[in-house]
């Protein structure tokens, strides 16, 4: 009976303790889908270096931001743009002075078919495909960049009816990898990380779309969590910048 009471007391204490004491050794991080592979390399390095643990949730930047606004327990936000972290500051969901650019995203046109094209821009202009994949431009910064590229080339209206939209850039990549779309606009980092056939890809000139400055910020829920602050600082380290560069991102 005493043992049962002890268990009950322990559970009660866990629930009564403020979050920063109950899980002070854990940081809850929301990460844009395009940064999935890099994050999976970075997290073990962080945990080994600091002794803290990390819980990660991946998704489109727009959907993650909506979850943050609705009270999701995220403490750090790694977005695929700077718009949402700025909004988080403005709406008092994030701590001012903690926001910074951790990576500069690059867009690629990719096909799982190695023989599909040698000149990506010319291939897009021919329209010689049934389906092209892109992320939702309303919620995914890489989707917005894809839209900008097509408008720059002058093919947005012509291709609009043949575009299939992924909820995020990870789903967009899967559409192409599984041949549900012949070609797709994806993050260059995904092509770099892909373990299968590299296929055909075109690294799209960066003057074809607005810069993709991917920013991180400390959220209000992580203000008193040392693990959250440590994670953000770790992102700025030379060790992490090497990982980020390896996946095809630009770094400061």
Question: What are the residue ranges of the model-derived segments?
Answer:
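Bacterial N-terminal signal peptides
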Residues: 4-19
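Exported/periplasmic ABC-transporter solute-binding proteins
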Residues: 23-51, 55-58, 62-72, 79-82, ...
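Active-site phosphate-binding/coordination module
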Residues: 97
């Amino acid at each position: 009976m005493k043992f049962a009471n002890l268990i009950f007391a322990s559970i009660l204490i866990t629930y009564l303790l403020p979050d920063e004491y109950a899980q002070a050794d854990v940081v809850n991080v929301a990460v844009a889908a395009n940064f999935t592979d890099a994050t999976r390399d970075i997290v073990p390095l962080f945990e080994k270096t600091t002794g803290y643990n990390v819980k990660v949730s991946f998704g489109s930047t727009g959907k993650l931001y909506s979850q943050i606004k609705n009270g999701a327990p995220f403490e750090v936000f790694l977005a695929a743009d700077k718009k949402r972290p700025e909004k988080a500051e403005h709406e008092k969901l994030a701590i001012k002075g903690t926001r910074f650019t951790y990576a500069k995203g690059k867009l690629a046109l990719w096909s799982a078919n190695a023989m599909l094209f040698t000149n990506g821009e010319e291939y897009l202009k021919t329209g010689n495909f049934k389906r092209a994949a892109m992320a939702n431009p309303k919620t995914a910064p890489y989707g917005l960049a894809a839209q900008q590229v097509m408008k720059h080339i002058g093919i947005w209206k012509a291709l609009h009816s043949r575009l299939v939209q992924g909820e995020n850039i990870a789903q967009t990549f899967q559409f192409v990898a599984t041949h549900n779309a012949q070609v797709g606009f994806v993050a260059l980092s995904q092509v770099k990380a892909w373990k299968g056939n590299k296929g055909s890809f075109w690294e799209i000139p960066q003057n074809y779309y607005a810069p993709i400055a991917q920013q991180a910020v400390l959220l209000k829920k992580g203000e008193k969590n040392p693990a959250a602050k440590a994670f953000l600082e770790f992102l700025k380290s030379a060790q992490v910048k090497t990982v980020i560069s390896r996946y095809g991102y630009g770094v400061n």
